Structure formats: structure tokens, C-alpha cells
Amino acid sequence: MKQKTFRAAVCSLATLVAFAATTLAHHGWSEYDEKTPLTVAGTITASSYTNPHGTIKLRATDGGKVWDVVLAPVARMQTRGLTQDMVKPGTVVSVLGYQHRKVATEMRAENITVDKKKIELR
């Protein structure tokens, strides 16, 4: 009986830890400065079209700074018309979003413009 109780406790604890880690890792939008919108135009140098959020590395046209841009979840991007092919390296885009409060080269995208087509991500 003690062994079953111990196993149940360990399984419960493992589930709780996994859930907490996933929750903390997923939505931390308060870490972005929503009071100061920022637009960055440039060329995508790398992209990841995966969950929980797609990402791109964007070399800014103005100054060459490389930004880590957090996009939307894949299902939302697909529903709104942003395909994986549209965010491949070499594509020129413009992103409107909010800069991370602590990471100077990271931003969360509200929308992205590709080939003069503006796509809302939030």
C-alpha cells in the first residue's frame, strides 16, 4: 500500500511540475513594453514555424541590428494567411510589435507585412 501511495504522490508531483513549467514558459506578455509600439523592417535570416509560437530572426534594414521576433502560434498564423513559405530566410518584411523589457533585441509581433500584405497576429 505504501508503494502505491508513494508512486501516486510522485506522479502527481511530476505532473504539477510539468504543468507549472509549461505555463510559465508559454505566456509572459507582460515582459514586453506595450506602451511603446515599434516597427522594424528588414530581411529574415532564420525562421521557426513551430509551436508554441513561431519565431524569426530579422536583420533590420536600418542599422543591421538582428531582432528575435516572436510570432503567433502556427494554427493562428495559418488561419490568418501567414504560411511557412512567407517567413522563410531571405524574405523582406516589416513587423509592428513591442520590445522586450529586458532583452534589447527581442520583440513580440502584433502584425507582419509581407509583399504589401499586412497580417494580424494577435
Across the structure, where does each feature detected by a protein language model lie?
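Bacterial N-terminal signal peptides
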Residues: 10-20
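Short boundary/loop segments of OB/S1/cold-shock single-stranded nucleic-acid-binding domains
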Residues: 23-38
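Conserved hydrophobic positions within beta-strands
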Residues: 42-44
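Short aromatic-glycine-enriched beta-strand elements
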Residues: 50-59
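A short macromolecule-binding patch
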Residues: 63-73
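OB-fold/S1-family single-stranded nucleic acid-binding modules
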Residues: 100-122
